[in-house]
């Protein structure tokens, strides 16, 4: 349905989008339980989270939004998102008023499911619009005759059929579609040199979901460097004279106004500390229940391996080891046994240090929108690698903007293929019931086959996108999946070590994502020197 | 992009749609005491696994034929037996004799859905892909888009993966038959078609075109030489494949007779429920079932069916061509559907699949027909709670067809293969200039009508005086469409020869 309206609205680009298989059509399907008897597809806790927020914002006054705690899923998104839920709740009451009762925990009537699922599909319209705007920014130098080989078409499919976004939003249940829509739209506006609009959109986005603060450095520096400085020196450094106070005031004004609109009421009520404490829950532990495939997953895995080895050769005293770390393996509060335990401050410092080079790059040799996008992806990836309590879904923050780069340069396309394949694979544990197994495998194959073959045909004349090592690494995801989902549950270890499949998935994917991150970093940094040499 | 990756994407897309539809409801879910086709299939597994073959088709103390007795040919029974074997390995409760009646659970549903999915993947989908690859004089893109449209055809998906049946098996075998015939592997083709026939007796709808085409081919080769040899070979193949399928039942004539009685239950009446065929639609005006005796009904329907089949079959026998064969498959199946005895609403699938085969030749008409055929099953789908899958798959199918064939630009007489017909009429009728526009607006009108009726039957309560208002109007409107299509297909078949001769002259 979304696809239909996109096709109708797009006029000139109509054919292109129409050939894109409509996501809406399929997105609607997995959640069709017309009969309570056959409510088949599971919905995650996030479904209940959002139902609860609908109820909270609908029934309570503003002053209690961030205090209400009947459900364990308290409101922990910024105020704009709460307002969004408030608006939705006024439509929801026409579907099933019972879902708006705060005490109705885990309430799932067919009408509730229909409404919630449909609200995600409907808000996806913004995402589709943003994709269209992004496609306009991609320069069509390679104007292929065949529509299937046009970069804009490929980009549209890569974004709209993004496996991660599809399963996280439409099966697992979240509202990432329109949030990423806002982000892509702001990127598109920056590419079109409509800086103020882009800044406004991003500021609004930040107050919808604060996870986007990870990429804020890229926005800040880019706006400062390319918008506030109106001219550059010949060697690419900023011309200090050209600094425009008017422009920075405008930017500041936008940010302040948006923040005032969002946080103002809570400041007046004196609830800012409470809001902040809800938004940044540092009590939650280094890793999420399932380790996101980042640096800390590798760190924890090494720690675990060392513990096992230590116990075997009697280097460690078994009585001193915290029990949880050996049995559960994936508990929330994770104590490392051999390696030093990690504090939130340490992760913050690591994140900061890892972001720094990319930001410097953006400042010292701005390459226009391309450089900005590279910096954006690097920021997202770095914070994914080193952040505190990172969710596996956060990888989408890097994958989606990287799609824009992948259709413009072969080198980025190679990195994109590694990152998406491993990143999407790491989302597999999100869907764990048997009926969802075929869906996730089919959708993943669909996206992977498309991304590989389309990018390969786009860069037909250049050298292969992946070298042999990368190819072998990616191919081995197949046996890994077969082992984790089919072989392992049949073995007797299933009961004793239930965490092994998750551990394997997370560690294996962490290697790939780490590699993609390093490769992208190296390519960005080395590009600088070569560009500088050329300039000299 | 390369052909194989496009085809892979098409297949994956088709599989995804199939699986997502299968997550929905099925026929008779949670509706004791009879449940629906889902329970029928499960019951057959139970019966075939637990009883000796001799008792499968007989009413015994362990096999109550009134409760979903087996009424399909042996291959269906073997298939059930095979599935039951797997079921036994997973959970013996699913097929326990007597106690498993009406068994429903999430894991059982998953199992049943998987059996359909696997059957579809192994038989129907490869046939479609190979068929599309074998299309001559078409670009890669056209081949892929034909495959996409055929695989996304909502009717078959909704009935097999939603309502719950194994039509893709018999239709898949029939497709393999067509495929083999198009490569001139006549023996293999007829063997494949025999398998289809032994899976579902409804495949008889397709048997005449197969017969006429092969017979015509024998005639063409000369009945005294090669033709006779081919005829003997074909007859041998058919007899042999039937014998293999029926081997366990050949012990006793009574066995065979009982199976046949089960397969052709002539006492069940002219039609059931609300079928979009001529008898059901006529009974809105005249209650045929009450006016005419059952024996006369049988004779009447037979006579009308036979008469409507005759012209195209004769034509095919006299001038056997692959194109004519496909078209005759359509028109014969449609005649059977409209006029024959004891037709189900699902039998329209037997017409739809041949129509799928000509989707790249007459995309506009094929799309239109496929939409109508899905719409004609709406009352059934509503009963099963498949409204949402129906709406979404239909819209997806329509947009896939519009995008890949640009159907709205292909409405001229030439695109509809009506050129010879219009030439023969020239002089009498002068409105042919307006023809494309008229056809297009008819299509839009019909699509709007179908949309409105779909929405109304889903959302509006019928007036108390006419509780069946919507099902009846759905079936009558579909029936009118089908009559129109029957005329259309007959016209293009019968006027085909001039066209091909002209083409030959040109070349």
Swiss-Prot record, chain B:
Transmembrane segments: 4-24, 115-135, 144-164, 169-189, 227-247, 298-318, 339-359, 362-382, 388-408, 442-462, 474-494
Single GO molecular function: dolichyl pyrophosphate Man9GlcNAc2 alpha-1,3-glucosyltransferase activity
Keywords: Endoplasmic reticulum, Glycoprotein, Glycosyltransferase, Membrane, Transferase, Transmembrane, Transmembrane helix
Lumenal side, ranges: 25-114, 165-168, 248-297, 360-361, 409-441, 495-507
EC numbers for this chain: 2.4.1.267
Alphabetical list of InterPro entries matching this protein: Glyco_trans_ALG6/ALG8
Residues with glycosylation annotation: 59
UniProt-listed GO biological process terms: dolichol-linked oligosaccharide biosynthetic process; protein N-linked glycosylation
Enzyme class: transferase
Pathway info: Protein modification; protein glycosylation
Domain of life per record: Eukaryota
Positions on the Cytoplasmic side per record topology: 1-3, 136-143, 190-226, 319-338, 383-387, 463-473
Family affiliation: Belongs to the ALG6/ALG8 glucosyltransferase family.
PANTHER family: DOLICHYL GLYCOSYLTRANSFERASE, DOLICHYL PYROPHOSPHATE MAN9GLCNAC2 ALPHA-1,3-GLUCOSYLTRANSFERASE
Function: Dolichyl pyrophosphate Man9GlcNAc2 alpha-1,3-glucosyltransferase that operates in the biosynthetic pathway of dolichol-linked oligosaccharides, the glycan precursors employed in protein asparagine (N)-glycosylation. The assembly of dolichol-linked oligosaccharides begins on the cytosolic side of the endoplasmic reticulum membrane and finishes in its lumen. The sequential addition of sugars to dolichol pyrophosphate produces dolichol-linked oligosaccharides containing fourteen sugars, including two GlcNAcs, nine mannoses and three glucoses.
UniProt protein name: Dolichyl pyrophosphate Man9GlcNAc2 alpha-1,3-glucosyltransferase
Native source organism of the sequence: Gallus gallus
């Amino acid at each position: 349905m979304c696809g239909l309206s996109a096709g109708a609205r797009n006029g000139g680009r109509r054919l292109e989008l129409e050939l894109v298989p409509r996501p809406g059509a399929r997105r609607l399907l997995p959640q069709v339980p017309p009969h309570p008897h056959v409510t088949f597809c599971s919905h995650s806790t996030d479904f209940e989270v959002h139902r609860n927020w609908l109820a909270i914002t609908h029934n309570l006054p503003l002053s209690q939004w961030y205090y209400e705690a009947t459900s364990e899923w308290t409101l922990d998104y910024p105020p704009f998102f709460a307002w969004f839920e408030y608006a939705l709740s006024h439509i929801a009451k026409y579907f099933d008023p019972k879902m708006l009762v705060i005490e109705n925990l885990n309430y799932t009537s067919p009408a509730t499911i229909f409404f919630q699922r449909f609200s995600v599909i409907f808000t996806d319209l913004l995402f589709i619009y943003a994709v269209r705007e992004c496609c306009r920014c991609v320069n069509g130098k390679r104007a292929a005759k065949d529509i299937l080989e046009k970069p804009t078409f490929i980009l549209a499919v890569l974004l709209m059929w993004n496996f991660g976004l599809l399963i996280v939003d439409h099966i697992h249940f979240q509202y990432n579609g329109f949030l990423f829509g806002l982000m892509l739209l702001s990127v598109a506006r920056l590419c079109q040199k409509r800086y103020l609009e882009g800044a406004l959109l991003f500021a609004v986005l930040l107050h919808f979901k604060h996870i986007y603060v990870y990429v804020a450095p890229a926005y800040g520096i880019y706006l400062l460097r390319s918008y506030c400085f109106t001219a550059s020196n010949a060697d690419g450094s900023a011309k200090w004279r050209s600094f425009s106070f008017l422009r920075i005031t405008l930017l500041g004004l936008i940010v302040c106004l948006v923040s005032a609109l969002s946080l103002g009421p809570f400041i007046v009520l004196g609830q800012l500390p409470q809001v902040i404490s809800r938004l940044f829950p540092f009590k939650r532990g280094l890793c999420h229940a399932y380790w996101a495939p980042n640096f800390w997953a590798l760190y924890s895995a090494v720690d675990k391996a060392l513990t096992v080895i230590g116990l075997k050769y009697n280097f460690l005293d078994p009585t001193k080891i915290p029990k949880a770390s050996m049995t559960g393996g994936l508990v929330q509060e994770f104590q490392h046994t051999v390696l030093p335990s990690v504090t939130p401050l340490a992760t913050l410092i690591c994140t900061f240090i890892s972001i720094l080079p990319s930001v410097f790059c953006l400042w010292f040799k701005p390459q226009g929108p391309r450089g900005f996008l590279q910096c954006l992806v690097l920021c997202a990836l770095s914070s994914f690698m080193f952040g505190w309590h990172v969710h596996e879904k956060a990888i989408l923050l890097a994958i989606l903007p990287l799609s824009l780069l992948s259709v413009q340069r072969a080198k980025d396309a190679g990195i994109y293929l590694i990152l998406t394949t491993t990143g999407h694979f790491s989302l597999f544990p999100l869907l764990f019931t048997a009926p969802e197994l075929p869906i996730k495998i089919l959708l993943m194959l669909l996206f992977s086959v498309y991304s590989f073959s389309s990018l390969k045909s786009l860069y037909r004349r250049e050298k292969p996108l992946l070298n042999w090592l990368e190819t072998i690494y990616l191919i081995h995801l197949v046996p890994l999946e077969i082992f984790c989902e089919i072989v392992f549950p049949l073995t007797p270890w299933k009961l004793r070590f239930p965490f092994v499949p998750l551990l394997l998935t997370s560690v294996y994917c962490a290697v790939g994502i780490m590699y993609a991150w390093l490769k992208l970093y190296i390519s960005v940094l080395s590009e600088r020197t070569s560009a500088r040499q050329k300039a000299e | 992009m390369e052909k194989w990756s496009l085809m892979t994407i098409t297949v994956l897309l088709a599989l995804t749609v199939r699986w997502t539809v299968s997550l929905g409801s099925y026929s008779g879910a949670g509706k004791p005491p009879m449940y629906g086709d889902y329970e029928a299939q499960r019951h057959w597994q139970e019966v075939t696994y637990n009883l000796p073959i001799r008792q499968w088709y007989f009413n015994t103390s362990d096999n109550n034929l009134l409760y979903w007795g087996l009424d399909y040919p042996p291959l269906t029974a073997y298939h059930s037996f095979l599935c039951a074997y797997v079921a036994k390995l997973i959970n013996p409760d699913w097929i326990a004799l007597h106690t498993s009646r009406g068994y429903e659970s999430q894991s059982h549903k998953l199992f049943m859905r998987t059996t359909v999915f696997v059957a579809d993947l192994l038989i129907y989908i490869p046939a479609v892909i190979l068929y599309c690859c074998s299309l001559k004089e078409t670009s890669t893109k056209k081949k892929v888009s034909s495959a996409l449209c055929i695989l996304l055809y909502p009717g078959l998906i909704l009935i097999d993966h939603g309502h719950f049946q194994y039509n893709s098996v018999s239709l898949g075998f029939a497709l393999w038959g067509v495929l083999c015939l198009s490569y001139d592997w006549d023996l293999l083709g007829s063997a494949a078609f025999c398998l289809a026939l032994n899976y579902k007796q409804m495949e008889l709808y397709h048997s005449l075109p197969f017969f006429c085409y092969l017979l015509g081919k024998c005639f063409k080769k000369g009945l005294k030489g090669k033709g006779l040899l081919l005829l003997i070979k074909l007859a041998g193949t058919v007899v042999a494949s039937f014998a293999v399928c029926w081997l366990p039942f050949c012990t006793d004539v009574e066995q065979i007779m009982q199976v046949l009685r089960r397969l052709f239950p002539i006492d069940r009446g002219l039609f059931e429920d609300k079928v979009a065929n001529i008898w059901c639609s006529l009974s809105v005006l005249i209650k045929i079932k009450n006016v005419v005796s059952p024996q006369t009904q049988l004779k009447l329907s037979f006579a009308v069916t036979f008469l409507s089949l005759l012209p195209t079959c004769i034509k095919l026998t006299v001038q056997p061509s692959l194109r004519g064969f496909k078209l005759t498959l359509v028109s014969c199946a449609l005649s059977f559907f409209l006029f024959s005895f004891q037709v189900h609403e699902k039998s329209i699938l037997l017409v739809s699949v041949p129509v799928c085969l000509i989707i790249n030749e007459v995309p506009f008409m094929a799309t239109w027909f496929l939409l109508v055929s899905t719409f004609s099953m709406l009352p059934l789908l509503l009963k099963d709670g498949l409204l949402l899958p129906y709406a979404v798959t239909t819209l997806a199918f329509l947009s896939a067809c519009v995008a890949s064939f640009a159907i709205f630009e292909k409405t001229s007489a030439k695109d509809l293969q009506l050129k010879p017909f219009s030439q023969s009429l020239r002089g009498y009728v002068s409105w042919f200039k307006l023809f494309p526009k008229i056809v297009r607006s008819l299509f839009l009108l019909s699509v709007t009508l179908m949309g409105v009726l779909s929405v109304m039957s889903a959302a509006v309560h019928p007036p108390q005086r006419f509780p069946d208002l919507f099902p009846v109007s759905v079936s009558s409107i579909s029936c009118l469409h089908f009559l129109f299509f029957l005329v259309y297909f007959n016209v293009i078949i019968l006027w085909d020869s001039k066209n091909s001769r002209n083409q030959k002259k040109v070349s």
